[in-house]
Structures are given as structure tokens and as C-alpha cells.
């Protein structure tokens, strides 16, 4: 995006955030600060309608009908466990897996104090002041009583193995009080705040969207990150690159064909890359007869120089093809990323 346009957007955002209403608590700034908590509570309460606190639920491979989170990755088995440690710590035990497997711990402010890749010891989750039992644990401290353990296990034509391993992902404890307050705002404030958040999405660096503790990232960046991809994680574990336009700056549409070049060297040993496409209208996977929603290190053929060529088109034909069929955007992900990797693809409209 042109630097001048970015500057105009940031000036507009600043002016809107500083605009006050008659109620000092019913402001755009207060709404944006509260937005991550709102979204976490909304997701938690929806999940609790069908699942039990402190118990894991696994999705299997996500398809376009799954609206649990926006911008999900397709070839991953997700595990969810909303819990409360109001009455004492909880312990998560996990199996060994020879491919990518991560355990992310979220609080209700969308802080992620820990993302542990292929854990080698039990994970103990606690609040400040709670006593740690004897044992060798990876200790994680939360800022809120309630939280989420979110697991990602990459699936490479081995769903049966993944499903069997998931039986060994368990929590001891986590069955405290699940009540969590949410601040309410006027419809006018909410509408104006979302104008700001939507404007920020186009200019925020995804590497600066998520933090471990409150204050790690700007509340503006966090709100934009949560709206675009709730349950996203800090950049040392997963790095993100948005694919919103072609190289001429035009939004991506479902009628044209695009050739995407993914750069080499995005991830370190044990990691992988993925490019997933989503409908602009709902931020979910796009239904198609091929049931192909992404390409990854495991499902695409590299070029000799280590780059990857992908074809995004209505039919999904072409090298490493992904079907589109409607207005869309993409997300490039690098798991176990190289810190120096450039998370930007080349997008050529044919």
C-alpha cells in the first residue's frame, strides 16, 4: 500500500479514536480496548453450549461450513478447551508427534503467554499466587481466570493417526467459574469503532498484532488482529502475511487467474508454510468440488530455487492450484518461522 495512503488512514484512525461521546466509558477507544475480550467471551460461550469446560473437543479437518473462527487453516486438526482456573491450576498432558503440533494458551484479553511446539513435558496453567504442585512442568501464568488451550496438529494424509493421538491430549482441573463480564456500548460507538478497526486491518503488520502479555502490542493492532484472525499467535511461533491484492494493487476476485510465488526460506527445521484462501464476504474457506482450500509444504511441489508457484483460479487448475470462484483474500503462514523471512508473495494476474 502507498505510504501516503497509509498515513492518511492512520490520521483518520487517530481522529476517530479521540472522538468522545457524552459517556466517558462509551467511547471508540474503550470499545476497541474491550473488543478482544468481547470476542473471546462470545467464542467461549458459544463453545460451552455444546461442550464441557476443561475438556478437549477436536474439529477434524476444517471445511467451509465451520465458522468457529474466521480464517481457519484447512489441513490442521484443531483442539479447543475453554477452562477456568479460578479454583486452582490446571495441567495439560500431550502425546509425542513427529510432525508440527502446537499448544497455544490464551487468556480472555487475547494475550498468548505461551505457544509450545511439540511439548516435551506437561503444561501447568496458573494465576498469580497459585501454588505450583511438585513435578517438572512448563509453567504458564494467565491474567484472567478463564482461558483457552488451543492445539494445532498438522494433518498429512494421516487423520487416523492424528485422531488416535488426540485421545492423549487431556486436562486435569480447569473446571472453575466460567462467568466473565463484558462491557456494553451504544450502537453508534460500536459502528464507529468498527470503521476504525477495518481501516487498521489494511495497514497493521501481522507480526505486531498479537502479544504474550497486556501491553506487548498496541490495543489498535490487537483489535485489528482479532477481527481478521482470532486465535492468531505471536510471530516467534507463526508468522503471517496477508494477500489482499495483486501486484497492481487491485483486490482479488473469483473470475480471474492469479499466479502466486511464495518465497524460499520462510521456516526452520520442523516448520512448514501454507497459503489458504478465504471468501471476502465471510472470512471462511471457499466451498469447491475439489475440496482444496490451501497449499502447504506437504501438498505443493517446490521450484528448484526453493520457491513455490501456486495457481489461484475459479477452476483450481494449474500448478499447485487452489479454487476460488468468488472475491477472496489469502493468508500466508510460516510455522516455526525464520525470523528474517520476508512474508510477502508475488501476485501476478493472468
Question: Model-flagged regions — what are they?
Answer:
Residues 23-350:
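A compositional/structural signature for long, glycine/proline-rich flexible linkers
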Residues 10-17:
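Bacterial N-terminal signal peptides
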Residues 2-9:
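Bacterial N-terminal signal peptides that target proteins for export
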Amino acid at each position: 500500500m502507498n505510504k501516503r495512503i497509509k498515513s492518511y488512514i492512520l490520521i483518520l484512525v487517530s481522529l476517530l479514536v479521540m472522538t468522545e461521546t457524552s459517556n466517558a466509558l462509551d467511547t471508540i477507544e474503550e470499545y476497541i480496548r474491550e473488543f478482544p475480550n468481547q470476542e473471546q467471551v462470545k467464542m467461549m460461550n458459544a463453545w460451552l453450549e455444546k461442550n464441557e469446560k476443561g475438556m478437549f473437543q477436536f474439529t477434524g479437518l476444517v471445511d467451509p461450513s465451520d465458522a468457529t473462527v474466521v480464517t481457519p487453516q484447512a489441513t490442521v486438526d484443531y483442539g479447543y478447551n475453554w477452562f477456568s482456573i479460578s479454583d486452582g491450576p490446571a495441567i495439560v498432558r500431550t502425546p509425542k508427534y513427529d510432525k508440527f503440533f502446537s499448544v497455544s494458551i490464551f487468556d480472555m484479553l487475547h494475550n498468548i503467554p505461551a505457544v509450545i511446539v511439540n511439548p516435551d513435558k506437561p503444561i501447568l496453567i496458573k494465576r498469580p499466587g497459585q501454588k505450583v504442585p511438585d513435578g517438572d512442568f512448563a509453567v504458564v501464568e494467565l491474567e484472567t481466570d478463564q482461558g483457552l488451550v488451543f492445539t494445532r496438529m498438522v494433518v498429512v494424509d494421516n487423520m487416523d493417526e492424528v485422531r488416535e493421538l488426540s485421545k492423549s491430549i487431556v486436562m486435569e482441573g480447569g473446571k472453575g467459574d466460567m462467568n466473565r463480564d463484558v462491557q456494553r456500548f451504544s450502537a453508534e460507538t460500536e459502528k464507529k469503532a468498527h470503521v476504525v478497526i477495518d481501516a487498521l486491518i489494511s495497514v497493521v503488520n501481522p507480526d505486531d498484532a498479537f502479544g504474550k502479555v497486556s501491553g506487548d502490542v498496541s490495543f489498535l493492532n490487537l483489535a485489528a488482529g482479532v477481527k481478521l484472525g482470532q486465535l492468531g499467535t505471536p510471530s516467534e511461533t507463526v508468522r503471517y502475511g496477508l494477500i489482499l491484492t495483486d501486484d497492481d494493487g487491485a483486490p482479488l476476485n473469483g473470475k480471474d487467474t492469479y499466479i502466486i510465488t511464495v518465497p524460499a526460506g520462510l521456516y526452520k527445521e520442523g516448520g512448514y508454510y501454507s497459503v489458504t484462501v478465504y471468501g471476502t464476504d465471510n472470512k471462511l474457506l471457499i466451498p469447491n468440488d475439489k475440496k482444496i482450500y490451501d497449499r502447504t509444504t506437504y501438498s505443493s511441489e517446490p521450484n528448484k530455487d526453493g520457491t513455490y508457484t501456486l495457481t489461484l483460479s475459479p477452476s483450481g487448475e494449474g500448478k499447485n492450484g487452489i479454487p476460488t470462484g468468488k472475491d477472496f483474500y489469502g493468508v500466508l503462514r510460516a510455522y516455526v518461522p525464520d525470523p528474517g523471512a520476508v512474508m510477502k508473495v508475488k501476485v501476478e494476474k493472468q
